[in-house]
Curated annotation (Swiss-Prot):
The keyword Transmembrane helix does not apply. One of its GO terms (molecular function) is DNA-binding transcription factor activity. The keyword Transcription applies. PROSITE patterns: HTH_MARR_2. Residues 5-136 form the HTH marR-type domain. This is Uncharacterized HTH-type transcriptional regulator YwoH. It comes from Bacillus subtilis (strain 168).
Length: 137
């Protein structure tokens, strides 16, 4: 077994932690963490979702999403609304979050650009392709 095969998951985890740490630094002026940004990004990109849809999409445990949404709600970023089915609640961005979203997104896109600046376009395409394959398993 090659070095890469023995250590790839560890390297991916270390990279994810480093990226999350640096993302948190970018988001700190907005009072957000990367996990919260993931939920906001998800809601803006996909639209109103149930908590179950969010945790399913983000591949995280239900209690984690519940805590994250609770904090976002307490800080005025999201609100829960009655869904078409009376038993379900939809999580939606607040008007204030909609206003701030673009500013945060621009900052995060710049962060991503800087983070990947030393990579060739072909490398970025390969990363994207491999991660999509991995997520489809």
């Amino acid at each position: 077994m090659s070095y890469v095969n023995r250590h790839l998951i560890h390297q991916i985890n270390q990279s994810a932690r480093l990226i999350a740490k640096k993302a948190n630094e970018q988001l700190e002026p907005f009072g957000l963490y990367s996990s919260q940004w993931s939920v906001l990004y998800c809601l803006r990109t996909i639209g109103p979702m149930t908590q179950k849809e969010i945790w399913s999409y983000l591949n995280v445990e239900a209690p984690t999403v519940t805590r994250t949404i609770k904090r976002l709600e307490e800080n005025g970023w999201v609100q829960r609304r009655q869904g078409e089915d009376k038993r379900e609640k939809l999580v939606v961005l607040t008007k204030e979050a909609e206003k701030k979203y673009e500013e945060i997104n621009v900052k995060m896109l710049k962060f991503e650009e800087e983070l990947l600046a030393d990579f060739r376009d072909e490398d970025k395409e390969a990363f994207s392709h491999l991660f999509r394959m991995f997520l489809q398993q």
